[in-house]
Amino acid sequence: MQVLDIGSGVGGPARTLAAEFGCRVTGIDITVEYCRAAETLTDKVGLSTQVQFQCGNALDMPFGDEAFDVVWSQNTMMNMEDKARLFTEVHRVLRPGGVFAFEVVLAGQVADPHYPAFWASSPSLSFLVSSEEMRAMLASSGLRERMWEDTTQRSIVNQRNRKQALAGGATPVLGLGVIVPTELEAKTVNGLRNNEEGRTCTVEAVYTR
């Protein structure tokens, strides 16, 4: 099985998918430093033959048509302004019957989010859309909805636990601070506030081609 991880970062989800399911995973990320770190970490855990990384733009992916069985994206689409173009690309690289699974932060019913947030330090880097807008763009791309789950309440529980851990001085060596080296506490607090106040919501969804 061939899996594509869009916005693969330092490669944690890609390595997990490969290790747990035995699939071959290709990660794509626009940040060169993330791709280099992902390659180094993947080599250290012995998964380089299963997991590879490509530095590139998800809106214009360097892959052939119908190249993947699964496309995966975990909390990266908030930084992509042209989501319609992204979904067109996802449809293109997926094989018929292929699966697009993602987790994303969406705009809530209340005014703009508090910043800094985990996905953006300021509004200029944030491109949130509502659930309705996201679903409409996905449908227009030709992808078919199979599951759409609002996970906001679960996110709130996790965020409260993270906030409490930070308040207690818990700073694990391999924690979020590795990839979020600045404003970690402020981003944690704002993430919780945004969900509690209805400024954002979190969703997990599965679509098929």
Where are these regions (language model features)?
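A short hydrophobic/small-residue beta-strand
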Residues: 25, 100-101
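Short, glycine-/aromatic-enriched active-site segment of Class I SAM-dependent methyltransferases
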Residues: 105-125
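A short acidic, Gly/Pro-enriched loop at the edge of an enzyme's catalytic core
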Residues: 59-70
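Class I SAM-dependent methyltransferase SAM/SAH-binding core
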Residues: 4, 10-60
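A short SAM/SAH-binding and catalytic strip from SAM-dependent methyltransferases
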Residues: 70-82
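Short alpha-helix
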Residues: 127-142
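Conserved Class I S-adenosyl-L-methionine
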Residues: 147-209
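A short glycine-rich, Lys/Arg-flanked "PGG" loop and its adjoining helix->strand segment in the class I
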Residues: 84-99
